[in-house]
């Protein structure tokens, strides 16, 4: 049986192996995609187009540049911070704070998932 204790839930997420962390990397689908594929959420993948829903960059839409399973964050084109020396660095965003607006279905396995 899995524990109900919050500390053990947090520890399980923190110590989860990478193949389990993929399940934490889901984001909601836009209403149009939801109707089309009859799914509420999907795993975020590099190449998807997402819209930021929360935070300072809410409303910004861009392509997913990278997915970091180790830190459970994604980077989106157009969402960045500036360092003190003026260089631009991508700002990490948690996938729960974005909405997928366009799926990258180049992968045959992923296309199979959505055609079920």
UniProtKB/Swiss-Prot annotation:
Is the Lipid biosynthesis keyword given for this protein? no
Q: Name one Pfam family in it.
A: Ribosomal_L26
List the CDD domains hit by this protein, alphabetically. KOW_RPL26
Q: Which GO terms describe its biological process?
A: translation
Asked if RNA-binding is a keyword of the record, the answer is yes
Looking at the record's lineage, which domain of life comes first? Archaea
Give the CC-aspect GO terms. Answer: large ribosomal subunit
Q: Which NCBIfam families match?
A: rplX_A_E
Question: Family per UniProt?
Answer: Belongs to the universal ribosomal protein uL24 family.
Protein name, per record: Large ribosomal subunit protein uL24
| Classification lineage | Archaea, Methanobacteriati, Methanobacteriota, Stenosarchaea group, Methanomicrobia
């Amino acid at each position: 049986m899995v524990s109900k204790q919050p500390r053990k839930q947090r520890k399980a997420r923190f110590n989860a192996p990478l193949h389990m962390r993929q399940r934490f990397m889901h984001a909601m689908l836009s209403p149009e995609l939801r109707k089309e594929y009859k799914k509420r959420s999907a795993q975020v993948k590099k190449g998807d187009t997402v819209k930021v829903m929360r935070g300072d960059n809410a409303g910004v839409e861009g392509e997913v540049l990278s997915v970091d399973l180790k830190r459970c964050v994604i980077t989106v084109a157009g969402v960045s911070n500036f360092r003190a020396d003026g260089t631009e660095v991508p700002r990490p965003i948690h996938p729960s704070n974005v909405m997928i607006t366009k799926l990258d279905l180049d992968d045959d396995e992923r296309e199979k998932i959505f055609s079920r």
